[in-house]
Amino acid sequence: MSVDTATLEDLGRELGEQIANSPEHKAFLEANEAVENDAEAQEMIREFEQLRHEFMLDREAGRADRESMREVQNAQQELHNLPVMEKYLDAQEELQDRLTAVNEAI
């Protein structure tokens, strides 16, 4: 392994550690845990996933209609309106913005 390769790998590990320790990543992990521990959010996620799965099967079979699509969209909107999900989605967006900025800098 050349010195340059070792240095690049070391820099990559350091970058990974810095990202993992960033406020954005920590906030995302906390928000994710809050969603995982919220019974209402988990139930709504299950319901949304079931509706989405059924819609995808119907779409593949040519049976999907606008009403079933609206039903999926409404379930998603209700899920996203939960305060715990709003915090999760905000934290996810902030982390993604940070990662995009890091990627552009590289």
Predicted regions and their residues:
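Acidic, polar-rich N-terminal leader regions of halophilic archaeal proteins
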Residues: S2-I106
